[in-house]
A protein has these predicted regions:
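The substrate-binding groove and active-site-proximal loops of carbohydrate-active enzymes
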Residues: 27-33, 67-80, 119-131, 152-159, ...
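Hydrophobic faces of well-ordered beta-strands that scaffold small-molecule active sites
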Residues: 24-28, 52-56, 97-101, 149-151, ...
Length: 339
């Protein structure tokens, strides 16, 4: 495909599997209640900001933390046809496409989330159900020529069963020929023991920044990124693979710096803090060769100046991201053998 540079009206070729090109990406959750919803206009909005990549996100659901009944749910999950069409629209818009399957919980207690899944009927049942969810999506990604596939997202409690993950990754390699990664939670990434089976280290970068500051300045945010950036550099060196930031995102609310993962907060609207947090992330990583790129979480949503959520649509953050994407980013350094 052709990557469109909105800042200069120029275009640069990007080809499938070209992991030497820095990923300046945006996640697009297929979260509409209509399973056949057309995400084409949102894809075009992302392209108009100068992004080179889109991470298409597909939610499946299991009934609760102790369950194993993973399935695409009508009214909450897209159809396979919609996923295929969206991947095609990303390529038609001149961007690279990645696909990330995510498991969510239908019923959850206050501390329940997918990182604490503990299947009551055993690991065999859960991994069988998970395999039924992700393998068809990997085949679909292969058919559509998607450049990347994320084998899992933030399944922290299940990561220690690395032999099962290795078996699944091997099966995914048979079905899919592009780049494979896994998306680990920022505080669990060092504990994952199957990075050697993947092409990139993936992490969600919801590091707590500037705790105790409701409205931190650009300078405070820049200082807060120093330690996480050193951790990421050390991780890339230890594993011998580049680090892909599979999610980085902020709600447009006060307090977003201290707990960036908190999606249900109801604090005062703060559009400019969201903008500064993206500015700070881009300041921190523009010249970091251990990082192969990032995806902003997440374009889907109403957006606009009264929206408290993650989406940058129609907010100052969207203009900040356009500037961020147009920067000169360091090419990922070869830190080791990919396979």
């Amino acid at each position: 495909g052709i990557a469109f540079d909105a800042a200069h009206g120029a275009s640069t070729a990007v080809t499938r599997g070209d992991d030497g090109a820095f990923v300046r990406g945006v996640a697009l959750g297929l979260f509409a209640t209509d399973p056949s919803w057309d995400y084409g206009p949102l894809v075009d909005e992302i392209r108009s900001r100068g992004a080179t990549d889109v991470l298409v996100v597909v939610n499946a659901y299991q009934s609760a933390r102790f369950a194993s009944d993973i399935a695409l749910r009508p009214g909450r999950s897209p159809s396979h046809r919609t996923v295929a069409r969206t991947l095609a629209q990303v390529h038609e818009a001149g961007m690279r496409a990645a696909l990330m399957p995510v498991v969510r919980l239908e019923r959850r207690g206050p501390r329940d989330w997918r990182g604490r899944i503990s299947p009551a009927d055993g690991l065999d049942a859960w991994f069988t159900a998970y395999r039924r969810f992700v393998l068809p999506l990997a085949r679909l990604a292969e058919q559509q020529g998607a450049e990347r596939f994320v084998v899992g997202s933030e399944l922290s409690s299940l990561e220690p069963y690395h032999a099962r993950w290795r078996a699944l990754i091997s099966e995914l390699r048979d079905a899919y020929s592009g780049l494979l990664t896994y998306s680990a939670n920022w505080d669990r990434v060092d504990a994952v023991e199957f990075w050697d089976a993947l092409d990139e280290v993936g992490l969600t970068a919801y590091f707590p920044l500037a705790e105790g500051h409701d409205r931190p300045s650009r300078e405070v945010i820049a200082r807060a990124w120093r330690s996480p950036r050193m951790q990421i550099d050390a991780l890339a060196r230890r594993v011998g693979k580049p680090v892909l930031v599979t999610e980085v995102g902020y709600v447009s609310q006060r307090g977003a710096a201290g707990m960036p993962w908190e999606h249900s907060a109801t604090n005062a609207l703060d559009l400019h803090l969201q903008q500064r947090l993206y500015q700070g992330f881009c300041d921190a990583f523009a010249q970091t060769p251990s990082v192969s790129g990032f995806y902003v979480w997440n374009w889907f949503g109403v957006g606009g100046p009264r929206d408290h959520g993650f989406t940058p649509r129609g907010k100052p953050a969207a203009n900040e991201l356009a500037k961020c994407f147009a920067r000169a980013w360091a090419a990922p350094a070869p830190v080791g053998n990919n396979r």
